[in-house]
């Protein structure tokens, strides 16, 4: 795969906030590095930390990580469909409904970390399998045009966005026992 960042027209305007967070132009390396970093960050936290919310209406740490894994799974599925030449417009999803239905609070943080790792390994396997043409393919997701390359960057940038929120708003606010 040629190392290049997606162009602004390769994704919806709202997605710029995620794409700009990804440093460099080697998306496979960025995804691999994130896998190690994110697993380390969350594995170091207690179950109590996993249940923490910095405000009553906000997701818990577990719910944020679960949301990151669910969103990656959806974006990778979109990338697979588009990479294989499927031109069917792909529907959006309501993130709050997914988080509510997932019941992450009923699961152990370590299990959610493991699921995140499995999802990322699966995404990496998919992206490593693609040829140049597949990376360039364009489809429609949530009513917007997107390329396979852009979806890989959205996975990485979306995770960085949420990790930043966790590190800035959640972890500093967790009361020490």
Predicted regions and their residues:
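Short, contiguous alpha-helical
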Residues: 1-10, 15-17, 50-95, 121-124, ...
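Short, contiguous, helix-prone interaction/anchoring segments in small proteins
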Residues: 20-54
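Acidic/histidine-rich alpha-helical segments that form the ligand environment
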Residues: 30-43, 97-136
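A general boundary/transition motif marking the beginning of the first structured unit of a protein
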Residues: 2-6, 19, 26-27, 67, ...
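Amphipathic, non-membrane alpha-helical segments in soluble helical-bundle scaffolds
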Residues: 24-32, 58, 62-65, 109-113, ...
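Short amphipathic alpha-helical segments at helix-loop
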Residues: 19-23, 60, 101-108, 143-147
């Amino acid at each position: 795969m040629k190392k290049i960042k997606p162009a602004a027209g390769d994704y919806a305007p709202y997605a710029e906030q995620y794409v700009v967070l990804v440093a460099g132009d080697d998306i496979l390396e960025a995804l691999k590095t994130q896998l190690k970093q994110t697993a380390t960050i969350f594995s170091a936290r207690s179950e109590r930390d996993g249940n923490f919310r910095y405000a009553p209406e906000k997701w818990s740490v577990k719910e944020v990580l679960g949301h990151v894994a669910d969103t990656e799974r959806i974006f990778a599925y979109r990338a697979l469909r588009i990479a294989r030449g499927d031109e069917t417009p792909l529907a959006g999803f309501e993130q709050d409904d997914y988080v509510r239905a997932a019941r992450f609070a009923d699961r152990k943080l370590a299990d959610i970390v493991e699921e995140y790792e499995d999802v990322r390994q699966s995404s990496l396997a998919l992206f490593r399998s693609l040829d140049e043409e597949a990376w360039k393919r364009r489809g429609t997701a949530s009513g917007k045009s997107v390329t396979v390359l852009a979806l890989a960057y959205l996975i990485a940038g979306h995770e960085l966005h949420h990790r930043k929120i966790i590190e800035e708003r959640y972890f500093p606010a967790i009361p020490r026992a």
